[in-house]
Amino acid sequence: MEEYKVTLDGPAPWGFRLQGGKDFNMPLSISRLTPGGKSELAGVNVGDWLLQIEGDSTASMTHIEAQNKIRASSNKLGLVLSRFAVGANHPKGVHTPESQGRKYNFAPSTALNKIARPFGSGTPPPDNSRPVQVTKPVAYNPPPTSYPSSQMPQGQLQNGQKSRTVSNVSGKDTTDHPIPPAPSTGPAVRPPWTTDPTFADRYAPDKTTTVMTKHTQPATPTPAQSRNSILQAAQVPSSGDKTPVCSQCNKIIRGRFLLALGRYYHPEEFTCSQCHKVLEEGGFFEEKGSIFCPCCYDARFAPNCAKCKKKITGEIMHALKMTWHVPCFTCAYCKTPIRNRAFYMEDGKPYCEKDYEQMFGTKCRGCDFKIDAGDRFLEALGFSWHDTCFVCAICQINLEGKTFYSKKDKPLCKTHAFSNV
């Protein structure tokens, strides 16, 4: 991280919007810059973390406390920010414009959802949602024909199935030695604002967002994959290999056997821990050392939908600290599934951005732009105004807190009270 200090000359506006805070469980950062504003000219970028305001650390500040600290500065505003020193795709001073601004929400904001956790893993991944890994066991039948030691084939090709999991499951001869599975490596984690151009807009403090994950079912491999998995497993054993012992009954295995999760099984004893169905041909899930068939795993561990109360076995919607079917979490007005887009809460009901803007949005009478959450505004002449937009229609002097006159719904100062508009 590269830290830098910025001093902005007053008065307000300072030309930036904040997001995050202690109450949102995320650090304070810059979510939006006014084109040509003081912050943009000073080299501040969208996504930069705000470390200090006027020498005070922001680590323990809520969003409102940070706003009040900034408002208290009148002549100068000193900030300490940080940004990633590498990976910047835009030159200094050039910023990608945002497609849409934030909405003004008159109801208390809902805290952002935390990162989704996939269902079906013994230890949930720390920072991303990954599909449940499913393993398919395969069985190997020894050939009925016996060969002399000099003519023993180097590999027997039999029917089987390969799984899409880190755990290698294969069938072997009784004297074969298992090949340890190779560890898998995941992609390097990058900050969300470097990979998602809409991160700042979707995670504005007044918005509520959703996260979707996938509850994956076992996949059926192709015949080519099956042949490859058996070919790698069925190698001629050395004379020093030991006879496998079943992990279920602790007896020596004679003939066919299964190898799953690093243990040997008789095919008929590799069963679901709940319904005791033989899992030789189907996929299975491993949870806390127990083995389950897909049906029992869904019934026992799959989450319930907050609306219909049924089990969720496909896409999972995470919103409002609950889980939903995607078709069950919809806009209260247009009934369209919100999916992974931002939404707004009004009277306890979710609304998509389009409908919320039409039904509850507020615009400034002076500039015709939306009044964002955290903006200072006032009510006058039956309209809402930004505090910097309520000016005399002729001389543009600010009229906040001053006596004014109106003509044709336009404010006028004392000097131009009787002028033509």
UniProtKB/Swiss-Prot annotation:
Protein name in UniProt: PDZ and LIM domain protein 7
Localization, UniProt: Cytoplasm, Cytoskeleton
Gene Ontology molecular functions: actin binding; metal ion binding; muscle alpha-actinin binding
Cellular component GO terms held in the UniProt record: adherens junction; filamentous actin; stress fiber; Z disc
UniProt record, GO biological process: actin cytoskeleton organization; heart development; muscle structure development
Comp. bias regions, Polar residues: 147-172
Start and end residues of each LIM zinc-binding domain: 244-302, 303-362, 363-421
Gene3D superfamilies documented for this protein: 2.30.42.10, Cysteine Rich Protein
PDZ domain boundaries: 1-85
Role according to the record: May function as a scaffold on which the coordinated assembly of proteins can occur. May play a role as an adapter that, via its PDZ domain, localizes LIM-binding proteins to actin filaments of both skeletal muscle and nonmuscle tissues.
Taxonomic source organism: Xenopus laevis (African clawed frog)
Keywords for this protein: Cytoplasm, Cytoskeleton, LIM domain, Metal-binding, Repeat, Zinc
Native organism taxonomy: Eukaryota, Metazoa, Chordata, Craniata, Vertebrata
Pfam families from the UniProt entry: LIM (PF00412), PDZ (PF00595)
PROSITE patterns (UniProt xref): LIM_DOMAIN_1, LIM_DOMAIN_2, PDZ
Region of interest (Disordered), ranges: 115-193
